[in-house]
């Protein structure tokens, strides 16, 4: 009998006989031959697990390959299977012994990951070239409008303490109306202290509490309906993952890391061109809220709900923006736990197919087809948020319901079913039922002609602006290269060795002379020694009679340094403009600004004169306060009594110095008492505390 020896090169166990000189450890070919002979006999295959043979034992490696980028990979699958890992050799099943082996074999079983069929949250962003507008269909305008128009006051107002000292509420006569950001009479002061709020009211109030929200934007969000509506629409698109942080809505944006896109439905009738906030700023506002912004794990929450419903309490613990972020990040959990159970897709074509199948097929086959049709028509959260194939009213109803059960209930099955009955308008005790998500063929998001024209004009203006920016950059680059360009000459003469300073000065003087409208003579600088002499001819310009209403136009000639061709450049004289500005300034100064017929300068002079007593009084009070509250220790340090350690004075600390400081403080009090008791008319006594 031989003994098994591990072969580290081939990662197999070989059989070595002690008495035979022919079979050695360094010659594995014989063991391979004997192994191949035994593989051919069925008896050897059956006794493989019981007795030790000379067959080399292959090692099976399980390699996990990510198949996400399988389409782009040019590497063959055979190259991936030749990977040797430092795994311990394992026993081969009997099925693997049927194949013949020519040597020590290492087989690897490749296990591929299934490709993701559903859309990822990272490829849902709106992507268009720079300058292309976002139309109504891109931003799902009808869906956003239905969300912000919802009148149900079902969300608890947890923002009262944040607005307690900053807003004065306005009382509405009669019954309380739910005013949303879609209403023309919108004013957040009418509902900021209500106990219950609508979705739009809670959303806009939450945005206004952000730490990154400026004072101006906060006031506009609370008082301006146009700003509040447009900001809520864009914030919702960022919140659900439809807009990434590389989008700007200002036409003259120059950042290379951003792309400009107009939104005609929000910008057409806007007065401010900078009405819309860019998406990086919106993301910063949404992520920096003062409360309820903690990390939320819906998976752990659902596990706690399944274990014990009583221990989970998520009511009023998170803000609505953070909750919407978490719902979109965990779309798979939402689909499995809620949408598959409580949402049913309904379409007319599907109903007709179901009726025909029930009439023709048996009952058992019909039931199977029903289940298959339900699975085929199953919807996801991203389908509801991104696509317009469903009714906007149904989509908004489902999204508000998802936010409601996560913010206002403990997510138990009883409360979830009760919320379904409430949203469907059913009575208590009735079956919970499901949400009906109706398919539609109607195109709700149709752009009118004026919005299409606005988007086209914005695209054209953007291209013109970018072309001007590119021309400016090219002009700057050419100017820099011309200044740094060395002088061109055939031979290096003495003029070439004058130094870089002289050349730079000459080029600067030359460029200055080029900008003047005077005729340019032939340059005698070293730069033009070896060039052909060219006599420049200025284009004749007919002088026009200057008037006050028309601008005087003069032509200046600029020399092209390559061929010395003259290109006329129009230069506008701003004398007429200056005269207009002077007239406007004089009219503004002579304009009567008060009821007494006084001009602006006279009114300012009277105002300064009336404020003189108050200014003197403030001056006196300030001087007395400074003199009274000024620390004595710096004074003592100046006099040389104390050291330079400016600590607060303590009794019986330094003896003589302590007595001196006490005397100084007492003298100050006596002096101040005399000044306070003195008469106000005595100017000589109080001259030191008054302005002369």
Curated annotation (Swiss-Prot):
Component of the chromatin-remodeling INO80 complex, at least composed of ARP4, ARP5, ARP8, RVB1, RVB2, TAF14, NHP10, IES1, IES3, IES4, IES6, ACT1, IES2, IES5 and INO80. The modification Phosphothreonine is found at residue 507. Residues 64-80, 493-504 have a biased composition (Acidic residues). It comes from the Eukaryota. Residues 340-385 form a coiled coil. It comes from Saccharomyces cerevisiae (strain ATCC 204508 / S288c) (Baker's yeast). Keywords: Coiled coil, Nucleus, Phosphoprotein, Transcription, Transcription regulation. Present with 1400 molecules/cell in log phase SD medium. The gene is IES1. GO terms for biological process: chromatin remodeling; DNA repair; regulation of DNA-templated transcription. The keyword Transmembrane does not apply. This is Ino eighty subunit 1. It is found in: Nucleus. Residues 28-56, 97-109, 513-528 have a biased composition (Polar residues). The modification Phosphoserine is found at residues 27, 487, 493, 504. Probably involved in transcription regulation via its interaction with the INO80 complex, a chromatin-remodeling complex. Its main location: nucleus. Residues 1-133, 465-550 are annotated as: Disordered. GO terms for cellular component: cytosol; Ino80 complex; nucleus. Disulfide bonds: none annotated. Residues 1-25, 465-485 have a biased composition (Basic and acidic residues). The keyword Ribosomal protein does not apply.
């Amino acid at each position: 009998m031989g003994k098994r020896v591990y072969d580290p090169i081939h990662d197999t166990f070989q059989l070595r006989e002690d008495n035979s000189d022919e079979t050695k450890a360094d010659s594995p070919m014989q063991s391979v031959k004997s192994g191949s002979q035994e593989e051919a006999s069925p008896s050897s295959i059956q006794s493989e697990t019981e007795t030790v043979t000379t067959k080399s034992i292959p090692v099976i490696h399980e390699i996990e390959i990510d198949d996400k980028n399988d389409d782009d990979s040019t590497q063959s699958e055979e190259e991936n299977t030749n990977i040797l890992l430092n795994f311990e050799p394992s026993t081969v099943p009997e099925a693997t012994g049927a194949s013949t082996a020519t040597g020590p074999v290492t087989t690897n079983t490749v296990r591929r990951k299934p490709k993701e069929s559903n859309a990822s949250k990272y490829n849902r962003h709106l992507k268009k070239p720079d300058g292309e507008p976002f139309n109504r269909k891109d931003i799902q305008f009808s869906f956003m409008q239905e969300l912000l128009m919802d009148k149900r006051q079902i969300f608890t107002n947890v923002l009262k303490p944040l607005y307690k000292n900053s807003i004065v509420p306005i009382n509405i006569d009669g019954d309380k109306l739910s005013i949303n950001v879609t209403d023309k009479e919108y004013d957040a002061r009418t509902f900021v202290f209500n106990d219950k709020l609508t979705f739009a009211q809670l959303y806009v109030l939450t945005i206004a509490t952000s730490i990154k929200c400026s004072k101006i934007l906060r006031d506009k969000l609370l008082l301006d309906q146009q700003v509040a509506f447009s900001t809520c629409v864009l914030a919702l698109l960022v919140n659900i993952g439809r807009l990434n942080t590389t989008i700007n809505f200002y036409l003259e944006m120059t950042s290379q890391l951003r792309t400009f896109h107009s939104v005609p439905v929000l910008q057409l009738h806007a007065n401010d061109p900078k009405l819309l906030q860019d998406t990086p700023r919106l993301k910063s506002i949404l992520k920096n809220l003062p409360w309820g912004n903690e990390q939320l794990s819906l998976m752990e929450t659902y596990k706690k709900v399944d274990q014990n419903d009583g221990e989970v309490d998520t009511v009023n613990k998170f803000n609505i923006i953070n909750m919407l972020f978490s719902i979109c990040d965990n779309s798979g959990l939402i689909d499995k736990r809620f949408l598959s159970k409580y949402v049913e897709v309904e379409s007319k074509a599907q109903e007709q197919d179901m009726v025909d199948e029930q009439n023709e097929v048996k009952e058992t086959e019909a039931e199977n087809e029903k289940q298959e049709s339900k699975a085929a028509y199953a919807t996801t959260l991203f389908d509801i948020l991104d696509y317009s194939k469903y009714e906007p009213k149904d989509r908004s109803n489902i999204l508000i319901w998802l936010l409601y059960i996560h913010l206002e209930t403990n997510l138990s099955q009883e409360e979830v079913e009760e919320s379904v009955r409430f949203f469907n308008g059913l009575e208590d005790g009735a079956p919970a039922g499901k949400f009906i998500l109706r398919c539609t063929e109607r195109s709700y998001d149709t752009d009118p002609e004026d919005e299409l024209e606005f988007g086209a004009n914005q695209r054209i203006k953007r291209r013109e602006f970018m072309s001007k920016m590119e021309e400016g950059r090219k002009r700057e680059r050419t100017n820099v290269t011309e200044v740094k360009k060395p002088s061109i000459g055939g031979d290096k003469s003495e003029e070439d060795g004058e130094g870089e300073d002289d050349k730079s000065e000459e080029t600067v003087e030359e460029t200055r002379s080029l900008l003047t409208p005077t005729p340019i003579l032939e340059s005698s600088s070293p730069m033009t020694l070896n060039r052909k002499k060219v006599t420049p001819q200025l284009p004749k310009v007919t002088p026009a009679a200057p008037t006050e209403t028309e601008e005087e136009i003069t032509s200046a000639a600029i020399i092209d340094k390559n061929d010395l061709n003259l290109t006329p450049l129009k230069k506008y004289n701003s004398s007429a403009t200056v005269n207009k500005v002077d007239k406007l300034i004089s009219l503004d100064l002579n304009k009567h600004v008060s009821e007494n017929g006084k001009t602006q300068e006279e009114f300012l002079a009277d105002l300064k004169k009336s404020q003189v007593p108050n200014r003197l009084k403030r001056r006196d009070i300030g001087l007395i306060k400074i003199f009274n509250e000024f620390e004595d220790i710096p004074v003592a340090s100046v006099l040389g009594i104390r050291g330079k350690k400016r600590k607060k004075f303590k009794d019986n600390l330094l003896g003589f110095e302590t007595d001196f400081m006490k005397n100084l403080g007492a003298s100050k009090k006596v002096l101040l008492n005399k000044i306070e008791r003195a008469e106000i008319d005595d100017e000589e006594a109080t001259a030191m505390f008054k302005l002369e």
